């Protein structure tokens, strides 16, 4: 009995998808990346933050975040320059990004993590889970402040 060509393709795709490893880094790998970041001893910096997914009011909006002494001190929308009304506590420092990545890696919801090749801070974190807990965080335009 011959299988139709479309069925061969479907069987091949199932085989490929079944072999696809979508597991992100382990909690111990995230811990190693954090240690590399900490070696730089950067406590004052700014970056642009973009979250997509997560079903919150900040999703899809680029935000300029300023961190001084390892604490978020200011946050403004890049497009308008307006202050973010949600409060500074909802925006992460790099250390808090690592905290979230490590927790997600431990419970299996960290899908991917991309790092800056020089300073080893996360540039992108992808999370999988229920719709309100799935999405991507992107860090760009990072600069060390004096």
Segments and roles (model prediction):
Residues 61-75:
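Short, flexible N-terminal segments of the mature chain
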Residues 71-109:
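A short-motif feature that recognizes glycine-rich, charge-decorated loops
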Residues 106-127:
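Extracytosolic low-complexity repeat regions of secreted or lipid-anchored proteins
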Residues 14-34:
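Bacterial Sec-dependent N-terminal signal peptides
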């Amino acid at each position: 009995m011959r299988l139709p060509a479309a069925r061969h393709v479907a069987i091949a795709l199932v085989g490929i998808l079944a072999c696809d490893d979508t597991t992100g880094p382990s909690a111990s790998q995230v811990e190693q990346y954090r240690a590399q970041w900490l070696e730089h001893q950067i406590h004052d910096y700014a970056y642009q933050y973009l979250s997509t997914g997560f079903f919150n009011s900040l999703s899809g909006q680029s935000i300029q975040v300023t961190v001084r002494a390892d604490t978020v001190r200011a946050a403004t929308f890049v497009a308008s320059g307006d202050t973010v009304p949600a409060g500074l506590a909802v925006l992460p420092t790099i250390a808090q990004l690592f905290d979230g990545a490590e927790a997600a890696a431990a419970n299996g919801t960290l899908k991917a993590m991309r790092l800056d090749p020089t300073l080893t801070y996360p540039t992108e974190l992808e999370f999988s889970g229920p719709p309100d807990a799935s999405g991507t965080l992107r860090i760009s335009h990072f600069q060390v402040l004096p």
